Curated annotation (Swiss-Prot):
Protein name as it appears in the record: Chaperone protein DnaK
Expression induction or repression: By stress conditions e.g. heat shock.
Residues with PTM Phosphothreonine: 181
Gene: dnaK
PROSITE patterns for this protein: HSP70_1, HSP70_2, HSP70_3
Keywords: ATP-binding, Chaperone, Nucleotide-binding, Phosphoprotein, Stress response
Length: 593
């Protein structure tokens, strides 16, 4: 039977863009945001005490220094981002910023579905460690979501693809290159069971790095004519370069060269600096060759780990917008010869769809599906000599529980420290420390005699619990490994209250921001009309009407009179409609987007 405790939405919380999906009966539906788009920029802006998310925040990137991008790269760390809003400095955790994105996705999903939503499945890169997974769950909690499951992005993609393939048995390789992370997973799909055979990846590699290579090239080209110019210290210039680089990367996926035009990118004592550069696909691929090569070994690693020959791979799924780059597709095809990547899936949406499918499984709406994922990295404890002794090895199917017996290193030792590490290096210090706890009350005895049982338990979310038990006395202690920047419960609850308290105000601010951009766009449109040759045919009365609208919009914007601004915007729309009827029903000037 279906569990009717509300919908469970599927969320792909991406570095660059995020996406939300839901199962409506047997249909997998990607939910559009208020801008009518199926993905939302993972951008958060802070202005006058308000929080702006998505497209509206992205439009402020050039003008608002309190705009945060790629926050996913900081998840699971103790790093914070600083903003200065209205002269007040504030430090924000990655969880808090991510929660604003999740809250925005949740809110528009509620409006589109007409239902209250409090449950979600959220995806993470397969190579996210324990702290990063915990941080994602915390972000969900701050956003008012019960995170029912954390699943790996490549696994979600395979789930979205394979659910409609019936009982066909196949091995599917998922190559997932997102904005900030990279994963490769190999799955065996048969009779509704999705088993991850192996996974590999790089949490510090993504489309942002390709953008940065273009930025470096642009700066170097400009420096040829302006050697003393320091663009890197100019935040606004760097943001323009970032936008130009991202646009060039996208265009070079479809064409052999692109023009990068940056008028007034800087001002020197000699005057303004204008840059107009042509970047070819060949040059772009040369600049980014080292990045592409970093994705080669993980493919080989998963095939080797799973003991699968490339010829045995039945399907290749390319996930993440960066996989649209031709060089990426060529590399994958060279690694898996005679098997073209599947191009029927949308690389930007498939992960969120897979998360929604998993939500359907948890609700009981989707039947006969079993998902068997793996832990991406070895989990170990530090033993005598600083050695990392594995308890659960990488690519072990989860959920899983494993135990080993250890003892004391010194005579009459009455307590032991259990230090937990994650990684593949032989020495503990070379891996990532996840946490430490102590077990006391051990009866004095010669070294090596007490028996201490260490148990590692990983749940379906990939989150680790470690228990130490003295088998002689029965005493035990345990720790749930959590984010190294863990927020205490009081702080989490404060953030939840803040988000709820500001909900109405944030909605008003967002509406005003959208009106501001609409008004500014109309002013630009009218100025273009009045400055065009066609304006000569306009009667003086019409020109006067347009000039009056421009003055009215500019005045309302300057005074922040929102009702007056709405009247002026409506006035332009009426003028446009009247003109359309007057001149025979032809197309009116387009309203700016």
């Amino acid at each position: 039977m279906s569990n009717n405790n509300g919908l469970i939405i599927g969320i792909d919380l991406g570095t660059t863009n995020s996406c939300v999906s839901v199962m409506e009966g047997a249909q997998k539906v990607v939910i559009e945001n208020p801008e009518g788009k199926r993905t939302t920029p993972s951008v958060v802006s802070y202005k006058n005490g308000e929080i702006i998310v998505g497209d509206a925040a992205k439009r402020q990137m050039l003008t608002n220094p309190n705009t945060i991008v790629s926050i996913k790269r900081l998840m699971g760390t103790s790093k914070k981002v600083k903003i200065n809003d209205k002269g007040v400095e504030k430090e924000l955790t990655p969880e808090e910023v991510s929660a604003s994105i999740l809250s925005y996705l949740k809110d528009y999903a509620e409006k589109k579905t007409g239902q209250k939503i409090s449950r979600a499945v959220i995806t993470v890169p397969a190579y996210f460690n324990d702290a990063e997974r915990q941080a994602t769950k915390t972000a969900g909690k701050i956003a008012g979501l019960t995170v029912e499951r954390i699943i790996n992005e490549p696994t979600a993609a395979a789930l979205a693809y394979g659910i409609d393939k019936g009982h066909r048995e196949m091995k599917v390789l998922v190559y997932d290159l997102g904005g900030g992370t990279f994963d490769v997973s190999l799955l065996d799909i048969a009779d509704g069971t999705f088993e991850v055979m192996a996974t590999a990846g790089d949490n510090r590699l993504g489309g942002d790095d390709w953008d940065n290579k273009i930025i470096e090239w642009i700066i170097a080209e400009i420096k040829k004519d302006h050697p003393s110019l320091d663009l890197k210290s100019d935040k606004m210039a760097m943001q323009r370069l970032k936008e130009a680089a991202e646009r060039a990367k996208i265009e070079l996926s479809a064409q052999l060269e692109t023009l990068i035009s940056l008028p007034f990118i800087a001002v020197t004592p000699e005057g303004p600096v204008n840059a107009e550069l042509t970047l070819s696909r060949a040059k772009f691929e040369e600049l980014t060759k080292d990045l592409l090569e970093r994705t080669r070994n993980p493919i080989a690693d998963v095939l080797k780990e799973a003991k699968v020959d490339p010829s045995q791979v039945d399907e290749i799924l390319l996930v993440g917008g960066s996989t649209r780059m031709p060089a990426v597709q060529k590399l994958v095809e060279s690694m898996i010869p005679n098997k073209a990547p599947n191009r029927t899936i949308n690389p930007d949406e498939v992960v969120a769809i897979g998360a929604a499918v998993q939500g359907g499984v948890l609700r009981g709406d989707v039947k006969d599906i079993l998902l068997l994922d793996v832990t991406p990295l070895t989990l170990a404890i530090e033993t005598l000599g600083g050695v990392a002794t594995p308890i659960i090895k990488r690519n072990t199917t989860i959920p899983v529980s494993k135990s080993q017996i250890f003892s004391t290193a010194q005579d009459n030792q009455e307590s032991v420290d259990v230090s937990i590490y994650q990684g593949e290096r032989p020495m503990a210090r070379e891996n990532k420390s996840l946490g430490t706890f102590s077990l006391g009350g051990i009866q004095p005895a010669p070294k090596g005699k007490p028996q201490i049982e260490i148990t590692f338990n990983i749940d379906a979310n990939g989150i680790l619990n470690v228990k130490a038990k003295d088998l002689t006395t029965g005493k035990e202690n345990s720790i749930t490994i959590s984010n190294s920047s863990e927020l205490d419960e009081n702080e989490i609850q404060r953030m939840i209250r803040d988000a709820e308290a500001n909900k109405e105000r944030d909605a008003i601010v967002k509406q005003r921001i959208e009106m501001r951009y609409e008004g500014e766009g109309i002013v630009n449109t009218i100025n273009e009309i009045l400055g065009s040759k066609e304006a000569e045919a306009l009667p003086a009365q019409e020109k006067a009407s347009l000039t009056k609208i421009v003055d009215g919009i500019n005045g309302a914007l300057k005074a922040e009179k929102w009702d007056e601004l709405k009247e002026q915007i409506d006035g332009f729309k009426k003028w446009r409609d009247d003109m359309s009827k007057k001149y025979g029903g032809g197309e009116a000037p387009a309203e700016p987007k």
